[in-house]
Amino acid sequence: MAGQCLMQEIALYELFFFSLLKTGSFGLSARMEIFFSKTAWNLIRQTYPKVDYAGIVRNKFNIPNPSHSIIAWMALNSGLQQIELADFIPTNTVTLCGLCMLEDESAEHLFSAAMQGGFFLSSVRNVDMISLQPTFMMFANGL
């Protein structure tokens, strides 16, 4: 093997290895084929039977985005529980109220302090504020 380049040595090793996979014995034989990565992949991969929803999930016209096909597979397979869905959706870690920028955002703050201060009502534009006030007061009173 002296004088051969590294690629020739790797190719020779692959011929021996895949000869072992195909025939069960080492050595170059007359029946050995040229190495193809597709052949090697088909020899070592594990196959499963095709499922009935494969055409929906893996069809590029139905679900073009691969990450969406994973979520679709989960929904069709197990119902996509909320705890699993939470792993895919990025969460907002900012706790400061987006309306007043003074306190942490909580239900109590949003429906009492922010409304009483008028921060929420002043942030909504092009809306008749008089017609909205009774609805907001119902939330503030806990109805």
UniProtKB/Swiss-Prot annotation:
Q: Which UniProt keywords apply?
A: Mitochondrion
The primary site where this protein sits is: mitochondrion
Q: In which compartments does the protein localize? A: Mitochondrion
Q: Which GO terms describe its cellular component?
A: mitochondrion
Q: What is this protein called?
A: Uncharacterized mitochondrial protein AtMg00120
Task: Supply the source organism's classification.
Answer: Eukaryota, Viridiplantae, Streptophyta, Embryophyta, Tracheophyta
